[in-house]
């Protein structure tokens, strides 16, 4: 096991225009303050205020959006980070672990990773992801790329269809088809900060949001040693070279994770579990009394000193006995949140310290709050009650289905851009308006400048005389469409769909 030295992980250099001659703790901290400013002032963070947390298209400002959720995660992440550093200080291990002059950057990386953790999520959350992946799967059929004979390949894109005698190209076709059918919010977040927004963050800060380490083009089983870390796609083919450089800069082995990412993940787990239940009460899906009974029933028999008793029952009793003229709802959730944090944050911090050798190496194949403890059981309780009584509610399911239809419909509306031949689309990109393509010209104009420039830059770097050029061009064209639609807010996607379907002016 390598020696734990966080000076080898908290890399303050950047991909472009990296600061030179940095020596003091204050100078390093200023670099991470610059990261903080770039992140907080980015349009992608502002768009989170109109993206779904649980309830799409919600007009009640008391119900959480992705932005308010991310701010709560940021606070919990800071709390866990401070708890870890405090315990390491008590153990006199800060200097031994190379953290004595890096406590500020340690906290800042965690906080900003928490704020950014949902930055790549599409409109309508997981149903938006499913809509994008299903739409591309129906056209690219990545599963057929593994089958024989080649005549069984149902891919509707000629450039990506497998061909006899072209095995090196066929392997690239397989990778591209798999990659495009595995859109994922975490992978899109990496693409956003590096390729689309060009935020030029420090290597350590980007490492903090690389939650999953599986490439989106991965086919087959994942290694048992990394099955949790590779549970979902973490980055796309378009960012393969960047991630390879990131691993080198952060001393990460293949498919391993950056240490501070475990803290971000734990903060997210703690935050959304209570928040989803509070939002459900705000939405009148159930009353706070009904919620308490749901929690009590799901936990089952317990003794007075159990975690359920100390956290949930305690919150319930305090909220009922409060003599102040405040609502039971507000009081219950205040106590529930405080009790939950006071139990789970120290537990997550200690789990981080206890497993630090594996976490530092990036190979700890679990979440911090995923074990056989009562703390893990408490999180499962909150999640299970939400699944049973919130996510399955007819109003929630109706809005999710509408969101799925909106994203699928938008992809279908923009499909003519993917149907153009390579030469025709190249002409459209160069001229921006082509008379014989009136529909395609208008659709192309609607794409954002940022996304169009990302496409042009990527394609301009490709050798145009290479046999791989048509494959890569089509890949980046699909990415262009995924970038544009996934970057929409819920409300913009909803309005755009209705306008283009001529439902309203």
From Swiss-Prot:
Job of this protein: dGTPase preferentially hydrolyzes dGTP over the other canonical NTPs.
Entry-linked PROSITE patterns: HD
Gene: dgt
A GO biological process held by the record: dGTP catabolic process
Domain annotation HD: ranges: 66-273
A Pfam family assignment: HD
Organism: Escherichia coli (strain K12)
Top-level lineage group: Bacteria
HAMAP family, A to Z: dGTPase_type1
Enzyme's top EC category: hydrolase
Protein name: Deoxyguanosinetriphosphate triphosphohydrolase
Family: Belongs to the dGTPase family. Type 1 subfamily.
GO MF annotation list: cobalt ion binding; dGTPase activity; GTPase activity; identical protein binding; magnesium ion binding; manganese ion binding; single-stranded DNA binding
EC number: 3.1.5.1
The protein's required cofactors: Mg(2+)
Family matches, as CDD domains: HDc (cd00077)
Keywords: Hydrolase, Magnesium
Taxonomic path: Bacteria, Pseudomonadati, Pseudomonadota, Gammaproteobacteria, Enterobacterales
PANTHER family: DEOXYGUANOSINETRIPHOSPHATE TRIPHOSPHOHYDROLASE, DEOXYNUCLEOSIDE TRIPHOSPHATE TRIPHOSPHOHYDROLASE
NCBIfam families documented for this protein: dGTP_triPase, PRK04926.1
Record's catalysed reaction(s): dGTP + H2O = 2'-deoxyguanosine + triphosphate + H(+)
Subunit structure: Homotetramer.
């Amino acid at each position: 096991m390598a020696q734990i030295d966080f000076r080898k992980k908290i890399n303050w250099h950047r991909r472009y225009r990296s600061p030179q001659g940095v020596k003091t703790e204050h100078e390093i901290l200023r670099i991470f303050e610059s990261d903080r400013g770039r992140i907080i002032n980015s349009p992608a963070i502002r768009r989170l205020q109109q993206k779904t947390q649980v309830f799409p298209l919600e007009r009640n400002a008391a119900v959480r959006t992705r932005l308010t959720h991310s701010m709560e995660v940021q606070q919990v992440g800071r709390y866990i980070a401070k708890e870890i550093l405090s315990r390491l200080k008590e153990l006199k291990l800060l200097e031994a672990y190379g953290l004595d002059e890096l406590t500020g950057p340690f906290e800042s990386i965690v906080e900003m990773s928490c704020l950014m953790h949902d930055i790549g999520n599409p409109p309508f959350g997981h149903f938006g992801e499913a809509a994008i992946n299903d739409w591309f799967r129906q056209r690219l059929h990545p599963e057929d790329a593994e089958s024989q004979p080649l005549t069984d390949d149902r891919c509707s894109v000629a450039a990506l269809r497998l061909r006899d005698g072209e095995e090196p190209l066929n392997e690239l076709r397989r990778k591209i088809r798999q990659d495009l059918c595995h859109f994922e919010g975490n992978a899109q977040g990496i693409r956003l900060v590096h390729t689309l927004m060009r935020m030029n963050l420090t290597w350590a800060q980007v490492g903090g949001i690389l939650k999953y380490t599986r490439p989106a083009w991965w086919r087959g089983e994942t290694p048992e040693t990394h099955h949790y870390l590779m549970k979902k796609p973490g980055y796309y083919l378009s960012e393969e070279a960047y991630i390879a450089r990131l691993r080198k800069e952060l001393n990460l082995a293949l498919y391993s994770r950056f240490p501070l990412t475990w803290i971000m993940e734990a903060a997210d787990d703690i935050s959304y579990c209570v928040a989803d239940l509070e939002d459900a009460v705000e939405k009148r899906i159930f009353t706070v009394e009904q919620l308490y009974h749901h929690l009590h029933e799901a936990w089952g028999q317990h003794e007075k000193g159990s975690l359920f008793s100390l956290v949930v029952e305690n919150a319930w009793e305090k909220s009922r006995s409060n003599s102040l003229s405040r609502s039971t709802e507000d009081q219950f959730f205040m106590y529930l949140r405080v009790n939950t944090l006071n139990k789970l944050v120290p537990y997550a911090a200690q789990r981080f310290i206890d497993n630090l050798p594996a976490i530092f190496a990036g190979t700890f194949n679990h979440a911090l709050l995923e074990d056989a403890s009562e703390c893990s059981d408490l999180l499962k309780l909150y999640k299970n009650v939400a699944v049973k009584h919130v996510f399955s509610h007819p109003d929630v399911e109706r809005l999710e289905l509408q969101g799925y239809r909106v994203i699928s419909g938008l992809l279908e509306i923009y499909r003519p851009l993917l149907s153009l031949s390579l030469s025709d689309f190249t002409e459209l990109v160069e001229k921006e308006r082509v008379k014989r393509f009136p529909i395609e010209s208008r659709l192309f104009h609607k794409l954002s400048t940022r996304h169009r420039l990302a496409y042009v830059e990527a394609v301009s770097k490709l050798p145009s005389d290479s046999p791989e050029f048509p494959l890569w061009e089509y890949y980046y064209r699909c990415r262009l469409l995924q970038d544009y639609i996934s970057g929409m807010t819920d409300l913009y996607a909803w309005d755009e769909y209705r306008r283009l379907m001529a439902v309203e002016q």
